[in-house]
Amino acid sequence: MAQDAITSVINSADVQGKYLDSAALDKLKGYFGTGELRVRAASTISANAAAIVKEAVAKSLLYSDVTRPGGNMYTTRRYAACIRDLDYYLRYATYAMLAGDPSILDERVLNGLKETYNSLGVPVSSTVQAIQAIKEVTASLVGSDAGKEMGVYLDYISSGLS
């Protein structure tokens, strides 16, 4: 089950029947210390999500083999499905960034996704390329520090698909 960073730290101590130790408190301090950064980034991403996905597709997929006749994104329906999926990844990576925990990505995004894509013939490498483009576009909008934070969760999705 997905947890935020706070719940994860507290549950770990609770299972052990202990008070929070210095390592746990440092983890919480780090989480709270980046809270404003994560919230500002999420706000910018939310306000620009469609543009982020559109620019990422233009950078990574638009003039590649997958968009040519016979390619996997050829036809409006397939293209729309790709855009929908990329928007979904951006949204859930944003949720994970706010929670400070990638486990929501396992539960809500990655569980069975690679197998589904393979069975449908969706080119995973092109999807990973598009996710990396989302990471680049997002970082240019939210700044270096927030971009690195968001990049952790987009990389997590890419790794889960690879």
UniProtKB/Swiss-Prot annotation:
The keyword Transport applies. The modification N4-methylasparagine is found at residue 72. It is a peripheral membrane protein. Its main location: membrane. GO terms for cellular component: phycobilisome; plasma membrane-derived thylakoid membrane. It is found in: Cellular thylakoid membrane. Induction: Constitutively transcribed in vegetative cells, not expressed during hormogonia differentiation in red light. Contains one covalently linked phycocyanobilin chromophore. InterPro entries: Allophycocyanin_b, Globin-like_sf, Phycobilisome_asu/bsu, Phycobilisome_asu/bsu_sf. PANTHER family: ALLOPHYCOCYANIN BETA CHAIN, PHYCOBILISOME 32.1 KDA LINKER POLYPEPTIDE, PHYCOCYANIN-ASSOCIATED, ROD 2-RELATED. Light-harvesting photosynthetic bile pigment-protein from the phycobiliprotein complex. Allophycocyanin has a maximum absorption at approximately 650 nanometers. Belongs to the phycobiliprotein family. This is Allophycocyanin beta chain. The lineage of its organism: Bacteria, Bacillati, Cyanobacteriota, Cyanophyceae, Nostocales.
